[in-house]
């Protein structure tokens, strides 16, 4: 075995950069996982390098094809694309770990033949007993005592019917690396023992296959979550061996991205609703808004600007600018940013994006009628400036797609009306009845109601218009009142005021 302490670290820059996104297909896509994908994508696009998409699907008990399909759906929705990997192909196929067993077995054979791996027969009980006998903490772990077993000693274990695990012979030196996010990180010699890479049944562990895949695929920069920081020295130790046997050319650069925190400054858990990417999509986040917010979980464009496009992110993104401190998922800020991006949409694009949410709430059918489409196009400008989530559309707009007879009234809105509401409705109906159909426009409707309620009855606008808003929309909050009346038309507006007046008079 050759000296293992002075192996080169990659110097790849620009188009030579190769990053990877290699999730396990378990559960629904987590915002922390997608943030990792986004940062890798942005770095690849910024440098002109390549993003490799690899699937780590070797946990048969937890992995599922359904989770894989959800992951693909999430990436496509956010327009995070990749240059090589599953679904795209490339020179290093296959890109699923479950299909790469022969490659791992070949590397294991080379590592064993070169002396980097050695057989370990010890049981957990025997390891604890050795630690006790030496006066050490029994839970201290393995003490490397099998490094230099003779062939006779190994054969004796085999004769007992034992099958060996394979451990990596860890260099007896400090292991340091320059983390792209955190600076120099050093693990002193002896920080961890020789560790198992292959189970006694011959199955390679994640600690082997992940770095081997990175090496075989020429990955130059490993950008991943902070939770994997502690495994990095083991991977570097393995890289020393992989370079020795010609599987790798250099050690990649590592960058460990900060935790995403939830409420109470606890790490965002898969059990937290905020962690579920599809939960945000279902509520009405748009890709542009969610991408922007995920980018802010550890990075920023400038100190005084939070709203930016994905292309602005690509232009500016450098992993060296990522903040190592934990990033808190602030739902209110995320929603506010999403609203900013909603207002940046072209009006016709915005209107079209509302349709699935209106359909899901049965406000409109699978196919919009001509009248429904015209109503949506006319109403969209009234709500675009007010919405933070597309999922607000049914509550804000459903009243425009029904009739006076079928309009549902919010009980709380009706009960909150003042005692003079019937008088307000009657006066408004009388005034509006005198407006000719041909002159039913915003200016005249507003003028008539203002003269009647504000000037004539001496009411404050909030109290005067409250019953009218409930009357036409069924709710306390709606798009602008006069514009809504014009969209509904004179007859429908008066019919709705009459219906509410009738309800209050019962």
Curated annotation (Swiss-Prot):
EC nos: 6.1.1.17
Q: Where is this motif: 'HIGH' region?
A: 23-33
Q: What is its main location?
A: cytoplasm
Per UniProt, subcellular location reads as:
Cytoplasm
What does it catalyze? tRNA(Glu) + L-glutamate + ATP = L-glutamyl-tRNA(Glu) + AMP + diphosphate
Could you name the Gene Ontology cellular component terms for this entry?
cytosol
Motif 'KMSKS' region positions after renumbering to this chain: 267-271
**Residues reported in the UniProt entry to bind ATP:** 270
Q: Name one GO biological process term.
A: glutamyl-tRNA aminoacylation
A GO molecular-function term, please? glutamate-tRNA ligase activity
What InterPro entries does the record point to? aa-tRNA-synth_I_cd-bd, aa-tRNA-synth_I_codon-bd_sub2, aa_tRNA-synth_I_cd-bd_sf, Glu-tRNA-ligase_bac/mito, Glu-tRNA-synth_I_codon-bd_sub1, Glu/Gln-tRNA-synth, Glu/Gln-tRNA-synth_Ib_cat-dom, Glu_tRNA_lig_a-bdl
Fetch the Pfam families from UniProt.
Anticodon_2, tRNA-synt_1c
> Which keywords appear in this protein's UniProt record, sorted alphabetically?
Aminoacyl-tRNA synthetase, ATP-binding, Cytoplasm, Ligase, Nucleotide-binding, Protein biosynthesis
Quaternary structure and interacting proteins, as annotated: Monomer.
**Task of the protein:** Catalyzes the attachment of glutamate to tRNA(Glu) in a two-step reaction: glutamate is first activated by ATP to form Glu-AMP and then transferred to the acceptor end of tRNA(Glu).
Family per UniProt?
Answer: Belongs to the class-I aminoacyl-tRNA synthetase family. Glutamate--tRNA ligase type 1 subfamily.
Protein name per Swiss-Prot or TrEMBL:
Glutamate--tRNA ligase
């Amino acid at each position: 075995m050759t000296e293992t302490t002075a192996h080169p670290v990659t110097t790849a820059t620009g188009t030579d950069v190769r990053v990877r996104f290699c999730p396990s297909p378990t559960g629904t896509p987590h915002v922390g996982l997608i943030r990792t994908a986004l940062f890798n994508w942005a770095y690849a696009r910024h440098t002109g390098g390549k993003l490799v998409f690899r699937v780590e699907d070797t946990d048969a008990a937890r992995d599922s094809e359904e989770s894989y399909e959800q992951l693909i759906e999430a990436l496509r929705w956010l327009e995070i694309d990749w240059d090589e990997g599953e679904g795209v192909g490339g020179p290093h196929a296959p890109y699923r770990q479950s299909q790469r067993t022969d490659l791992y077995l070949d590397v294991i054979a080379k590592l064993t033949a070169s002396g980097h791996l050695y057989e370990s027969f010890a049981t957990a009980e025997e390891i604890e007993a050795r630690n006790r006998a030496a006066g050490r903490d029994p839970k201290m772990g393995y003490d490397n005592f099998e490094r230099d077993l003779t062939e006779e000693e190994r054969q004796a274990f085999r004769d007992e019917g034992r099958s060996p695990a394979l451990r990596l012979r860890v260099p007896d030196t400090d292991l340091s690396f320059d983390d792209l996010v955190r600076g120099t990180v050093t693990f002193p010699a002896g920080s961890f023992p020789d560790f198992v890479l292959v189970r006694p049944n011959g199955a390679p562990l994640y600690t082997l296959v992940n770095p081997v895949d990175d090496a075989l695929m020429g990955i130059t920069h490993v950008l991943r979550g902070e939770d994997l920081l502690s495994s990095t020295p083991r991977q570097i130790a393995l890289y020393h061996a992989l370079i020795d046997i010609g599987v790798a050319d250099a050690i990649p650069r590592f960058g460990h991205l900060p935790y995403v925190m939830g409420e109470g400054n606890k790490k965002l858990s898969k059990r937290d609703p905020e962690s579920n990417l599809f939960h945000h999509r279902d509520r009405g986040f748009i890709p542009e808004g969610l991408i922007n917010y995920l980018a802010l979980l550890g990075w920023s464009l400038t100190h005084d600007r939070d709203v930016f496009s994905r292309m602005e992110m690509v232009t500016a993104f450098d992993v060296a600018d990522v903040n190592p401190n934990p990033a808190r998922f602030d739902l209110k800020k995320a929603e506010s940013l999403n609203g900013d991006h909603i207002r940046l949409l072209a009006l016709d694009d915005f209107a079209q994006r509302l349709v699935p949410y209106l359909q899901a709430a049965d406000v409109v059918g699978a196919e919009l009628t001509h009248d429904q489409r015209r109503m949506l196009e006319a109403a969209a400008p009234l709500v675009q400036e007010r919405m933070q989530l597309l999922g607000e559309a049914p509550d804000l707009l459903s009243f425009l797609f029904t009739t006076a007879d079928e309009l549902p009234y919010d009980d709380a809105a009706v009960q909150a009306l003042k005692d003079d509401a019937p008088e307000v409705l009657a006066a408004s109906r009388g005034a509006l009845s005198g407006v000719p159909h041909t002159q039913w426009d915003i200016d005249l409707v507003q003028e008539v109601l203002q003269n009647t309620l504000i000037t004539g009855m001496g009411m404050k606008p909030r109290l005067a218009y409250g019953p009218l808003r409930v009357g036409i929309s069924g709710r306390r909050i709606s798009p602008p009142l006069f514009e809504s009346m014009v969209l509904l038309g004179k007859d429908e507006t008066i019919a709705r005021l009459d219906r509410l007046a009738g309800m209050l008079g019962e």
